[in-house]
């Protein structure tokens, strides 16, 4: 009797398990069939928000939030496009709702999806992610980059810090009121004390490399010129009144020596040719001289050449007078 009851209980348990398995399998098959035939109750998000053959599921997910649907299908039909012909008659007439007073989509007091709103709400009382009047970038308006604005600077409190510390008592690397670039400001210059030094020493008694009041560029100013004594007794490289460019003054020298009346290009003018004495030289002297004389003779017969020579002579005379005047002015200055 006991064996029969045990066998019956085992059979009952086995049948129950088999029924549950079949029921679960049937539900799965039914669900798959519904998904295949698009008969399930889930909103078909993959079809797109505005699919015509899908009814919005107000009772599921975020669609139950009325704020989500606010402005989407209400009176201003923004989904028609910004430049739809709807409302153009009123848009272009002057008056309160004229084109010069309207916003992006119509009236002057509306924003993108409603009246005077910002990105996610009404414009007049929100900022980027909340209310404008009391928030900053990530919170309230009275804060700075990483905290409250009125009591912080870049990395701390603004009113009592500078770049890396307190503002009112530091400079770039220390205290501002008593330092310069690398030390105290009121009693130093660039590399020392300001009131008693110049660039490399004391200011009131030095020049560039020494004392200012008694030196020139490289020595004493009142008694030297560029490289030595002052201009009244030297020229460019020596005494001015008795030298020329490289030696004695112009009245007794030429370009490289004595003046033009007794030298040529590289020596005496009246007794040399191009590379030597003119009257006794050959291929580069006599022949050239002969050609030059022949060419000069033929040119002299041309009236235009004579006019040009007169002009050149006048120009040379004017140039010579100007040079002499400049030399006289330099002599007077010295």
From Swiss-Prot:
Coiled coil: none annotated. Residues 27-116, 122-125, 131-134, 140-142, 148-151, 157-160, 166-169, 175-178, 184-187, 193-196, 202-205, 211-214, 220-223, 229-233, 239-242, 248-252, 258-262, 268-271, 277-280, 286-334 form a propeptide. GO terms for biological process: neuropeptide signaling pathway. The modification Phenylalanine amide is found at residues 120, 129, 138, 146, 155, 164, 173, 182, 191, 200, 209, 218, 227, 237, 246, 256, 266, 275, 284. It comes from the Eukaryota. Keywords: Amidation, Neuropeptide, Repeat, Secreted, Signal. Neurons associated with smooth muscle fibers. One of its GO terms (cellular component) is extracellular region. Residues 1-26 form the signal peptide. Residues 115-289, 303-334 have a biased composition (Basic and acidic residues). InterPro entries: FMRFamid-related_peptide-like. It is found in: Secreted. Not known but it could act as a transmitter at neuromuscular synapses. Belongs to the FARP (FMRFamide related peptide) family. This is Antho-RFamide neuropeptides.
